[in-house]
């Protein structure tokens, strides 16, 4: 069953057709990877779906509800959340408070994080449990700025996950980390997301990661979809080999 659908979605920047008439469907429960070379349109597509950009034309639906021109806040309430390629944390807050702030925002009680006496015990407990799920529970009281890069990536995903989304976008969750940290991040994220029955769309450049963890892979090229299918089909696709992998099948 489809959770998200775009119809003839377009976004142009001058002569650059960043997203050029894209019809995109994300099915409930998928762990989907969105791949392509730099400038292919991946991040622009996610920015359109998460309301960081408005489309020039086309439509966006979540569970058949038209959200094309709704705000970021309205899309969060509709069940869309995301993490960022450049980690977007409150560095002066503790690791625990970063997650708690996301939970308070979900509950419409953001200001309470600034008043320790008003902090809800249940919220802080939920935040602590989420950190354990993501493997960084031991760092709960540490300042976010003091985390290692891999830990910061996990915290960024945990902050988005704390919103209890139906659809979670992860923008290059393994960029800038070691091979060992990539495996730890993806093992953890895949386990938590699948365990929570969350639908995930991951922008990723490392094709080893893509082929190992994805149910489905969508390849973008010059603002359009070049290929769409299970990992084994994408591996054998001659167009993908030419434009993305730089090889011939």
PLM feature spans:
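Glycine-rich phosphate-binding loops of nucleotide-dependent enzymes
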Residues: 2-249
């Amino acid at each position: 069953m489809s959770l998200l659908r775009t119809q003839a979605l377009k976004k142009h920047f001058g002569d650059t057709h960043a997203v050029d008439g894209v019809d995109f469907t994300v099915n409930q429960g998928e762990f989907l990877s969105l791949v392509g070379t730099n400038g292919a349109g991946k991040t622009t597509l996610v920015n359109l779906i998460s309301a960081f950009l408005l489309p020039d034309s086309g439509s966006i639906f979540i569970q058949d509800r038209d959200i094309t021109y709704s705000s970021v806040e309205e899309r969060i309430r509709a069940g869309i959340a995301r993490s960022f390629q450049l980690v977007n944390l409150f560095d002066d807050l503790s690791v625990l408070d970063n997650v708690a702030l996301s939970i308070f925002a979900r509950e419409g009680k953001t200001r309470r994080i600034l008043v320790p006496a008003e902090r809800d015990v249940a919220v802080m407990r939920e935040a602590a449990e989420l950190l354990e799920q993501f493997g960084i529970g031991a760092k709960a009281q540490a300042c976010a700025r003091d985390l290692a890069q891999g830990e910061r990536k996990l915290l960024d995903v945990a902050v988005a996950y704390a919103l209890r989304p139906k659809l979670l976008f992860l923008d290059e969750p393994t960029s800038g980390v070691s091979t060992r940290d990539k495996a730890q991040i993806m093992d953890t994220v895949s386990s938590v997301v699948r365990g929570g029955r969350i639908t995930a769309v991951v922008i990723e450049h490392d094709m080893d990661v893509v082929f190992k963890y994805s149910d489905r892979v969508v390849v973008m090229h010059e603002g359009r979809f070049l290929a769409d299918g299970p990992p084994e089909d994408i591996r054998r696709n001659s167009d993908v080999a030419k434009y993305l992998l730089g090889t011939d099948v």
